[in-house]
Design a protein with these regions (language model features):
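Noncatalytic regulatory segments and standalone regulatory/sensor domains
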Residues: 1, 118-205
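Cysteine-nucleophile protease catalytic domains, especially the papain-like/related folds used
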Residues: 2-80, 84, 90, 156-159, ...
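Short, charged low-complexity intrinsically disordered segments located at boundaries
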Residues: 58-64, 95-97, 115, 167-175
């Protein structure tokens, strides 16, 4: 990975806040990120894809699959606070999953991280119906840890996360290919071959997909 120089504080104020209906926090959070990345969509359009009535909520797998159906690259972050802050510093809001409950009561929640302040040790989220939710890093990490640090970056094909690792990125591109989006995968592989020009795996993936097409 390339070295990253993060500013002390960053906020992405133009990230929209999608309107949320009761129990539809996941569609709203996903709509927020998709819209921020140039794919305007409403939570109502996503409910059927991500909301599971029997669970009264959503699962990460549905969130990831739905992002791909909108022809976006769904890149799972490594689960470190460093990678999350790096993406925010580069202008990318990050979809996260938290458990706001406790040891005896689970309260799963999807939110979008849109800023941080390292001096004050705080994060800024689009959370539920709150456009600017401030929380401490300590509280966020505790609630985030309960989801095994699940975090998803959603980008247009061809854009590479600032914190990307080669194999993780190639896997995200391959997932596009296996869902019938070979053109989007090809765009991603091509970007990878330029980002990591010395890596044979990137060129092989690009060449094989180009040949198959």
């Amino acid at each position: 990975n390339r070295p990253h120089h993060r500013p002390v504080a960053v906020e992405l104020p133009h990230t929209p806040l999608a309107p949320q209906q009761p129990s539809h926090g996941a569609p709203a959070a996903l709509a927020t990120v998709l819209s921020a990345q140039g794919t305007p969509v409403t939570p109502d359009e996503l409910v059927e894809s991500v909301y599971l009535p029997e669970l009264h909520g959503s699962l990460p797998e549905e969130m990831t699959a739905t992002a791909r159906r909108y022809r976006m690259l769904a890149y799972p972050l490594s689960g470190s606070l460093t990678s999350l802050l790096t993406e925010i510093a580069h202008g990318n809001p990050v979809l996260v999953m938290q458990n706001l409950g406790n040891d005896w009561f689970e309260n799963w929640h999807f939110a979008v991280v849109i800023g941080y302040d390292l001096e004050n040790k705080t994060l800024i989220l689009r959370s539920g119906t709150t456009k600017r939710w401030d929380t401490t890093l300590a509280v966020f990490e505790r609630t985030w840890a309960r989801s095994d640090y699940w975090a998803l970056l959603i980008l247009p094909p061809g854009e590479i996360p600032a914190s990307a690792g080669l194999l993780r990125y190639l896997q995200a591109a391959h997932d596009r290919e296996t869902t019938g989006q070979a053109d989007a995968a090809l765009t991603a592989y091509r970007a990878a071959s330029f980002r990591w020009p010395q890596e044979t795996a990137a060129w092989l993936a690009y060449g094989n997909t180009l040949y198959a097409g």
